[in-house]
Amino acid sequence: MSAPVLTTSSGSPIDNNLNSMTAGVNGPILIQDFTLIDKLAHFDRERIPERVVHAKGAGAHGYFEVPSSDVPKWCKAKFLNKVGKRTPIFTRFSTVGGEKGSSDSERDPRGFAVKFYTEEGNFDMVGNNTPVFFIRDPSKFPDFIHTQKRNPQTNCKDPNMFWDFLGQTPESTHQVSILFSDRGTPKSYRHMHGFSSHTLKFVNAQGKPYWVKLHFTSETGIQNYTAEEAAKMSMNDPDSATRDLFETIAKGGEPAWKVSIQLMEFEDALKYRFNPFDVTKIWSHKDYPLIQIGRMVLNRNPENYFAEVEQAAFSPSHMVPGIEPSPDKMLQGRLFSYPDTHRHRLGVNYQQIPVNCPFAVKGGVKNYQRDGFMAVNGNGGKGPNYQPNSFGGPEPHPEFAQHKFDVSGFAARQPYNHPNDDFVQPGDLYRLMSEDAKSRFVSNLVGHMSGVTIKEIQVRAVSNFYKADKDLGARLCKGLGIDVNDVIKFAARSNL
C-alpha cells in the first residue's frame, strides 16, 4: 500500500521534506521555499500558554450512566431523567501547582474535572480529589497560587512564602491537613476519589430547590504513596499517573467511579451549624449521607493529547437546566475566572474546539455570537447577528429561567459570618487517623516546614495545627525544634 502524499498546510504536495531550496548547492536558502517557511513558522507557534494552574494532566473519554429512577425527584436535568441513560463524558485529571513537565507524584491536590456532553448543553464538574479547598474567598486566589509557584527572585520553590501565606490563612488548615496526609500523594488517578467541593443547587421540574455536593468514589479504591515512595517514583517515572491511566484503558480496563450526592433541603442552609457554602468545610455524612445518582466509566483514550487533553477547557459556569450555582464565594469567583482564562489560552471561540463543543445539543448551538479568532463553525451563516429580529433567529424561552431566591444585607466587602471556627474539622481529621498515619502526617509536615528559614513563620504555621489538636502541635514543635510555649503564646494572641 502506497503512503499518502505529504502536503503543506495549504494542501500543496511536497516533493522533498529533508532538503531546503537553495541558490546552488552551497548557496543561501531562497525565501520562495514555502515548504520550509510553512514548516518552521508553524513549529515556532506550536506552544500555547500553559495553564496557570493544573498544567500537568491526563484525560480519557467515557460515559455517565444513571442507575436510579429517584434522581428526577431532585433535579430536572435531562441527562439524569431515565434509568440506564448514558451521557458521553470527557475527564481530565491533573496536579495543581506544578508546571507541565512536573512529576505526577508530587505532593499536591489533584484536579478532577468531568465534561458531560448533554442534550441541553455541556455540564462541567470542575473539582478536586479533596472535599475542601485552601481558601473561601476568590480575592485570595491569585496570592495563594503565587505562593505555590516559584519565588519571583530566585525562581525556586520557596517554603517561606508557602508557609507565610498559609500560616496567615487559618481557613487553609483543613485542606493543608489533607494535603500532607497520605492522600496528598495518590498512587494514580484511578486510585483517588473526586469531589465537587463546592455546593451546587439542584432544581426539580416543580421548581423545588436543593443544595448538593457531588462525590465520585473510586471503584478501584484509594491507594497512596508514602513520601519516600512518591519521591522515588518522581525520579523513576515522573509521568507515572498519566502512563497508568492510558495503559490501563489501552489494555481494556475501564476505571470507574460511583457518583453520589449529599442532599440538603434548601431551608436547612440557614439552620446548619456552619455556613454550608464555606468550601473549607465538609458536610457531615451523618447529617447528609451519600445518595448514588450515577456511575462514571472511562473506556477510551484520546487519539491526540494536544487536541483533546491540552485543549480541553472546563468551567464551573457551564451548567444545564436543573443545576445552578450556590452562593459559595469561591465558586462565584471561578464562574468568571475559568472561562476567562480559556479565552486567553485558547481564544474566544474555544468552545468550537471539538473536545469542548456541545455536540449533543439537538440542532446545535444557536446564538448571536460572531467572528473572533478561529470561528470555524459556520459563524452563523447568513442568519441575523442580532436579537430581536424578524428573520427567524433563535429566541429565549422563559421556561428555562433559573430558580429565584431571596437575598438581603448590605453590599460590602465582608467575610462569611458563621459560628464555627476553622480548626474543628482538621482536628477531627487528625484524631481519626491511625497512629501510623499520624506519624507520617507529622513527618510530612516537619519535612516541608524544615525548609522555612524564618522562625516566626514556622511558629505561626504550627500554631494553627496546635489550635486544631494540641498533640499535633506538640509533635510538630518537637520535630522542628520549636519551644511549644512559643506556639501556645502565639496561638493565644492570634486573632486571624
UniProtKB/Swiss-Prot annotation:
Oxidoreductase is among the record's keywords: yes
Catalyzed reaction equations: 2 H2O2 = O2 + 2 H2O
Positions occupied by motif Microbody targeting signal: 494-496
Disruption phenotype: Cells are resistant to methanol, acriflavine and thiabendazole.
Pfam families per UniProt: Catalase, Catalase-rel
Enzyme Commission number: 1.11.1.6
InterPro entries in the record: Catalase, Catalase_3, Catalase_AS, Catalase_clade1/3, Catalase_core, Catalase_haem_BS, Catalase_immune_responsive, Catalase_sf
Family designation: Belongs to the catalase family.
Function: Catalyzes the degradation of hydrogen peroxide (H(2)O(2)) generated by peroxisomal oxidases to water and oxygen, thereby protecting cells from the toxic effects of hydrogen peroxide.
Name of the protein in its database record: Catalase-A
Organism for this UniProt entry: Dictyostelium discoideum (Social amoeba)
Gene: catA
